[in-house]
Amino acid sequence: SQMGVVLQETFLFAGTIRDNIAYACPNATDEMVIEAAKTANAHDFIMDLPQGYNTAVGAGGHSLSGGEKQRIAIARAIIHNPKILILDEATAALDTETEKLIQDALKKLVRNRTTLAIAHRLSTLRNADRLLVLDHGKVAEFGTHSELLENRGIYYKLVMAQQKLGAMPKEAEKKLPEALPAAEG
């Protein structure tokens, strides 16, 4: 298949960490698995596990944190190397430090491929080439992060609301134009 998916709720299969990363590419060499894990910022935590890449995880990966499971899913997508990638809330429900690791991994993963990213945490979308804003199931706005902020429409209001709530990481706030005051109403 030419399509890869990284979901908010990552599913891991019963087997080893290596098996889970290589799932979409069963003939992957150890070097390929390790390289994918490094790119996904997963290698270091994997090496801290009792048996490294040979550590067994049960179905669902309950012994791993959400961020660790997410990075394994990203490594799985990297090794699969799809032409089209779907990211469905890939950074939701993560702490800021883990989100940064996953953001860095996702930047590498989306490079040179068509990516459809679904997100409520708007900071995850700021580097997209093109954003589509849906309102009641219809495209209400489209453009780059900067263009949508300048238009002061729905996207702008959502970004401002997240900024006020503290839901936007500091590095994303720095990219907001200083000349744009918060939206009214």
Name each model feature, range by range.
Residues 1-9, 17-22, 27, 31-42, ...:
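ABC-family ATPase nucleotide-binding domain "signature/switch" substructure
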Residues 46:
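Nucleotide-activated donor-binding/catalytic signature segment of Leloir-type glycosyltransferases, i.e.
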Residues 150-184:
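C-terminal boundary and immediately downstream tail of ABC-type ATPase nucleotide-binding domains
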